[in-house]
């Protein structure tokens, strides 16, 4: 509460009247008291607008003559296409768990305040791996991918005190995550002590596959059991398809857990360029000292 009062310039004795608290989150009460609050970065009250919803997905109409019935949304991440096709991958390739599906592609987010270009843009290149594993082994696989992805950046030349691996606190975790670690880099244009995120490794559990199934697996009978709400309607809006996996060796059927390394391609490229940039006293003034694994020219002989 003290932090909220400080940020919004509210006296502590008025905090209970101005704020509402729910599961560790602070919300303004929707009344006239908000107009007397000084917003962050403002010098006087009255700058806060009424709360309203924002759609963070880009809506478009498919077809030159399409109407609202032809509405579609640009994907905000590449991950969901992998989850939707999970069953197709298993059935067509006969792959066995644990296995992963990797993808590079464009994603689109209707950012409210796009800024800093590479770090907050409405269109960006995303690299993701969805690694499917048995629930009992998911924590070990999370640690594996967390450490392996960090080492990957080290092997490419990002090392020293400019690169770090930071685990999320409990109040930072996304709604689908049971554990997340961020690989961060101290870009030279950031203030001292600040880092920019390169990649996040998240333990997504079975959240995505269960959401797409529109139900939950009954461990006693194995078939998909549809969950309903108090009105008898489906509780989850999914496909209704069975996305469980059966281990042929044990006949164990389960919903796989997912470990997701997710990175911005342009962020990693920018970090490698910053790391390679080397001032020089010679006439060239500067040269790029790339790691040999990514150097376009491995060696040269000059007269």
Give the positions of each predicted feature.
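TRNA-recognition modules of translation machinery and tRNA-sensing kinases, especially anticodon-binding
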Residues: 1-303
């Amino acid at each position: 509460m003290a932090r909220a009062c400080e940020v919004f310039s509210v006296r502590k004795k008025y905090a209970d009247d101005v704020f509402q608290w729910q599961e560790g989150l602070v919300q303004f009460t929707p009344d006239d008291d908000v107009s007397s609050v000084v917003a962050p970065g403002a010098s006087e009250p009255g700058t806060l607008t009424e709360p309203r919803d924002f759609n963070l997905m880009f809506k478009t109409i498919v077809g030159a003559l399409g109407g609202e019935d032809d509405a579609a949304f640009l994907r905000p991440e590449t991950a969901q296409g992998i989850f939707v096709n999970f069953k197709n991958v298993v059935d067509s390739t006969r792959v066995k768990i644990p296995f992963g599906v990797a993808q590079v592609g464009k994603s689109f987010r209707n950012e409210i305040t796009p800024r800093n270009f590479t770090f907050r843009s409405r269109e960006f290149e995303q690299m993701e791996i969805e690694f499917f594993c048995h629930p009992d082994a998911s924590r070990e696989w999370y640690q594996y991918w967390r450490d392996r992805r960090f080492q990957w950046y080290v092997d490419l030349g990002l090392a020293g005190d400019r690169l770090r691996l930071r685990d999320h606190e409990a109040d930072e975790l996304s709604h689908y995550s049971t554990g997340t670690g961020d690989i961060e880099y101290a870009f030279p244009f950031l203030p001292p002590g600040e880092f920019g995120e390169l990649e996040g490794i998240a333990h997504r559990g079975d959240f995505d596959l269960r959401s797409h199934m529109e139900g939950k697996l009954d461990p006693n009978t194995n078939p998909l059991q549809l969950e309903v709400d108090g009105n008898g309607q489906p509780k989850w809006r999914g496909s209704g398809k069975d996305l469980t996996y059966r281990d042929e060796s044990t006949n164990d059927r389960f919903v796989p857990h997912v470990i997701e390394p997710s990175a911005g391609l342009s962020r990693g490229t920018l970090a490698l360029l910053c790391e390679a940039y080397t001032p020089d006293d010679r006439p060239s003034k500067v040269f790029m000292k790339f790691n040999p694994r990514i150097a376009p020219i491995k060696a040269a002989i000059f007269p």
